[in-house]
Regions:
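Flexible juxtamembrane loops connecting transmembrane helices in multi-pass membrane enzymes
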Residues: 228-274, 278-282, 289-300
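Hydrophobic transmembrane helix bundles of membrane-integrated enzymes that assemble
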Residues: 1-254, 329-420
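A short, flexible low-complexity segment enriched in Lys/Arg and Gly/Pro that occurs
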Residues: 158-164, 254-269, 315-317, 323, ...
Length: 422
C-alpha cells in the first residue's frame, strides 16, 4: 500500500502524499512499540537524527521569524522522512522479500498519479476541475517519457535481478546511457554508465559482487574516467551538431566561463553554490525554511560567476516580481536542508551519505536479489544528493531503509546470527 500511493497527493491546504499521510499517523506508535528492535538492530541513530532535525527546524524557523507557510513546509520534511522510514523499515524487518512489492507499487503509482491524485501543477489543475489539462501537464513534462521508460525498464532488475538474463541488464543500461546522452542528460549519462559498469563487472555471482569492496579504489578511478569521457563525448557531439540547435545554444551558454569541470558545474549547477554560500553564512542555525534571499546571495553569485543568460533571467524575474525577495536557491539534498535548518539537518544528511557509501563499498552483496537495485539507484542517489532537490520522498526513503536493513544484517553477523543474505 505504501508503494501504490507513493506518488499520489491529497490537498488539505497543503499538499501531502496519501502514503505519507497514512505513515504520519502510524509511525509514532510503531516507533514507540518497536523501538527496542530498532535499537537492537543498531539503526535507531537514523531515527534519532531525524527527531533532532525536527527540533532544529523549529528552532531555526523561530530564530529566523519564518512565515507559517514556510514553517509547515520545512517542518514536514523530517517528519515525513521519519514517518515513512519507520513504516518501511518495520515491514522490511517482518518480511524483507516484500521489498520487491514496494518497488512494484511505486512503479504502478507513477502511472496512477497521471490520472488521479496528481502532484504539483497537475494537481492544482485537477482541483480546479480541468482533468484533461492536468493529465496533459504530466505527460507534457519534458522528462516524463524518459522517467517512465527508465522506471519500467529497470523494474525487472530491481525486483528479480537474479532471474533476469544478463544481456537484458546490459541492453537496458546501455540503451538508457545512449538515450540520456542524445537528449542532453549529461549527468544521467554518467550515472547510467556507472551502473552499466557495475552490472557488467559484478554479474550475478556472490563472488563477483564482492569485488566492489576489493576494487573500490579502481571503481573511483573508473568513475572519474567516466566523468571525463562524458564531458568530452558531449562536447564533441555538440560541436559536430549531432544534438540540435537547442543543445548547441545550451552548451555555448554554460561554457562562457570556461570548459573545465568546475566551470561547467558552476554554470550548470549554480544553485548548489548559491545554497552553499548561504549555508556557510549560518552553518549552525540555518537561514530558516524556504529562506528568503534578503542578503542577495543569488545576485552576488551570478554577478561573479553566472552566465549572461542566467543574469538576464534573474533580472527579468526581479522585474516581474516587482522587486519582491525570492527564496535562496540550492537544488541539493544536503545543501538545501543545511541551509534551511543548520547543523541538525546537516548531521542527518551526512549520516545518510555514510550509510550509502559504506553500503556501496561493503554491503551490496549481502542480499544478491537486491544487487541490481543498488547498482542502479546508488549511483543516481550520489548525484542527486549533491545536485538535485529532495522530491520523491517514498522512493528515497525506500532506499534509506534498504541501506538500514543491510546495516542490520551486518550487525547480526557480528553477533553470530545470519539473518539474511550471503
Amino acid at each position: 500500500m505504501i508503494g501504490c500511493f507513493s506518488m499520489t497527493q491529497l490537498r488539505f491546504g497543503a499538499k501531502i502524499g496519501i502514503s505519507e499521510l497514512v505513515c504520519c499517523f502510524i509511525a509514532p506508535f510503531l516507533f514507540f512499540i518497536k523501538y527496542h528492535e530498532f535499537k537492537k538492530d543498531k539503526v535507531a541513530l537514523y531515527f534519532w537524527l531525524l527527531i533532532f532535525w525536527v527540533f532544529g527546524a523549529i528552532l531555526s524557523d523561530y530564530i529566523n521569524e519564518s512565515f507559517a507557510a514556510q514553517v509547515i513546509r520545512g517542518f514536514s520534511v523530517p517528519v515525513t522522512i521519519f514517518s515513512v522510514s519507520v513504516c518501511i523499515y518495520y515491514n522490511l524487518r517482518k518480511n524483507a522479500d516484500g521489498f520487491k512489492w514496494l518497488l512494484f507499487g511505486i512503479a504502478c503509482s507513477s502511472v496512477l498519479s497521471i490520472f488521479v491524485f496528481q502532484r504539483g501543477i497537475a494537481g492544482d489543475l485537477a482541483a480546479e476541475g480541468d482533468i484533461s489539462a492536468a493529465v496533459e501537464s504530466v505527460i507534457g513534462y519534458k522528462l516524463f517519457w524518459a522517467n517512465t521508460l527508465m522506471t519500467w525498464l529497470t523494474l525487472p532488475l530491481f525486483v528479480a535481478y537474479l532471474k533476469v538474463p544478463r544481456f537484458y541488464a546490459v541492453f537496458v543500461m546501455a540503451g538508457l546511457s545512449v538515450f540520456n546522452l542524445l537528449t542532453g542528460g549529461r549527468s544521467m549519462f554518467l550515472v547510467s554508465m556507472f551502473s552499466l559498469v557495475l552490472l557488467i563487472l559484478c554479474g550475478k555471482k556472490i563472488e563477483t559482487m564482492r569485488t566492489v569492496k576489493k576494487a573500490f579504489p579502481i571503481i573511483l578511478v573508473a568513475l572519474l574516467s567516466l566523468g571525463l569521457m562524458a564531458k568530452y563525448t558531449y562536447q564533441y557531439a555538440v560541436k559536430e551538431g549531432w544534438m540540435g540547435e537547442a543543445e548547441i545554444a545550451k552548451y555555448e551558454t554554460q561554457s562562457q566561463k570556461g570548459t573545465g569541470i568546475l566551470a561547467l558545474l558552476m554554470s550548470g549547477r549554480s544553485d548548489f553554490f548559491i545554497g552553499l554560500i548561504a549555508a556557510l553564512d549560518k552553518p549552525l542555525i540555518g537561514q530558516g525554511s524556504q529562506a528568503l534571499d534578503y542578503k542577495g546571495y543569488t545576485g552576488e553569485f551570478l554577478a561573479k560567476y553566472g552566465t549572461d543568460q542566467e543574469i538576464l533571467e534573474y533580472s527579468r524575474n526581479q522585474m516581474q516580481s516587482n522587486g519582491m525577495v525570492g527564496t535562496i536557491r540550492s537544488h541539493s539534498h544536503i545543501i538545501c536542508y543545511w541551509m534551511w535548518h543548520g547543523v541538525t539537518a546537516l548531521l542527518f544528511w551526512l549520516y545518510v551519505f555514510y550509510l550509502s557509501v559504506s553500503a556501496f563499498k561493503n554491503r551490496m552483496h549481502y542480499i544478491p536479489e537486491w544487487f541490481g537495485y543498488f547498482a542502479i539507484t546508488l549511483p543516481a542517489f550520489f548525484w542527486h544528493y549533491f545536485f538535485s532537490p529532495f522530491g520523491l520522498r517514498v522512493n528515497e526513503c525506500a532506499l534509506y531503509c534498504a541501506l538500514l536493513y543491510l546495516l542490520k544484517i551486518e550487525n547480526d553477523r557480528k553477533r553470530g546470527y545470519v539473518s539474511y543474505g550471503n
